[in-house]
Amino acid sequence: MRDADLLKKIFEEHEFLGVIHFAAKKAVGESCHDPFLYYENNIMGTINLLEVMNNVGLKNILFSSSATVYDAEKNIPPFTETDRTNTMNPYGTTKLVMEYILKDMVMHKQFRSVVLRYFNPIGAHSSGLL
C-alpha cells in the first residue's frame, strides 16, 4: 500500500467494484515499541490507497478497524458503535485516525465506506458476554 505507483497500475489494469482493506501492522506491543513504523505503514499506506482509489474513481471501501479504538477505561465490553473512543496504544490510534480519514472521504469525496471494529479473535471475554 505504500507504493502508490504500483497501486495505480493495479487499479488501472483491473476493474474493481470496491476495496476490502485489511492491510495493516497489528501487534499492540510492537506498536508501543516502534510507533513510527505503525504511523507510516498503517496511516500513510491507507492515505496512498485512498488517493489512488479517488484518482481512478473507485469509491467503495470496507475497512477493518479494531475494538482498540474504544475507551477501555470508560466502557465495559460489549461495546456499541456509540461508545466513546480513546485509544490506549499506537496501533489503536492508527485505526482511529484511519476511521476519521474515511469519514472525511465520505463527506467530501463521495466515498462509501463500511467500518468493522473487531474484538479479540483469540477467545471469549471472561464475562461470557462475548
Feature map (PLM): residue ranges:
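Short, glycine/acidic-enriched loop or turn micro-motifs at the edges of active sites
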Residues: R2-D3, A24, N120
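A generic secondary-structure signal
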Residues: K9-E13, V52, D104
